[in-house]
């Protein structure tokens, strides 16, 4: 069911992303927007401390983070995570994607993309450039 108050639903799938998750989530909460957005987190039974980090951010930002934390890995059972768990929860007019081991560096990312889509109704999607880095932050080729 759509909700007029939420314009963007951010879909974030997590599996053993503990080393990267805080940076990912900080990229969400630093967003400067003139609209409401939600972050739909799905943890697929991580064996590290990903679930603890998800709960921490959900407690701190309950109006933004909407988690599902699985007890059994769904992907290994052949379950389509987006189709089964993520897309049915979407309330926004627009959907953004960011995996738990990725992160956003631009605090205006969502605002810029929504402005672009709202300005020209012939656009059905937009994306931004990426910078590939290793876990220590060193830029990789590409």
What are the functions of these language-model segments?
Residues 1-142:
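Nucleotide-sugar donor-binding/catalytic module of glycosyltransferases
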